[in-house]
């Protein structure tokens, strides 16, 4: 039996797009807010078994609205989701990964290497968030 994994990274949600002005900035920000829903839709369309998000999902400072949008989309994926925070959204006390409530199907790796067994998929997922070398 094969395993279908959806992998993505570097969304940089809530990026200020500081090098753009006016309409281009607005367009990019609106397009960026559609990414979580597009991930959910792609997960369903492709019948994925799990999702791996490998860092910099947020650009840095984030809005709670965006975090809620992401949490809802990830929950609606209906499969295990694994997040390894990156250098822009590192795992720490002020990060969205610690401050916000995430659905039960979402596992967020901290700065230490760890793993999660998924017996129903006959696999083990290893991960670590940014800061693992600290």
What feature does the model see in each segment?
Residues 1-6:
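Extreme N-terminal starter segment of soluble prokaryotic enzymes
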Residues 8, 54, 84, 126-128:
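Short hydrophobic segments within beta-strands
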Residues 9-14:
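Short polar catalytic/cofactor-binding loops
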Residues 15-19:
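N-terminal donor/sugar-recognition subdomains of glycan-related enzymes
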Residues 21-116:
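Core catalytic region of metal-dependent phosphoesterases/phosphodiesterases
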Residues 119-134:
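Binuclear metal-dependent hydrolase catalytic cores centered on His/Asp/Glu-rich metal-binding motifs
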């Amino acid at each position: 039996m094969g395993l279908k994994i959806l992998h993505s990274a570097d969304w940089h949600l809530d990026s200020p797009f500081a090098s753009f002005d006016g309409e281009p900035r607005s367009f990019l920000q609106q397009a960026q807010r559609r990414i979580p829903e597009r991930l959910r839709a792609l997960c369903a369309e492709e019948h994925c078994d799990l999702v791996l998000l490998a860092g910099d999902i947020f650009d840095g400072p984030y809005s709670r609205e965006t975090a809620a949008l992401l949490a809802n989309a990830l929950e609606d994926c209906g499969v295990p989701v694994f997040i390894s925070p990156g250098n822009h959204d590192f795992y720490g006390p002020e990060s969205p990964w610690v401050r916000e409530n995430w659905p039960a199907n979402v596992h967020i790796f901290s700065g230490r290497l760890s793993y999660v067994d998924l017996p129903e998929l006959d696999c083990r997922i290893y991960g670590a968030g940014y800061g693992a070398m600290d």
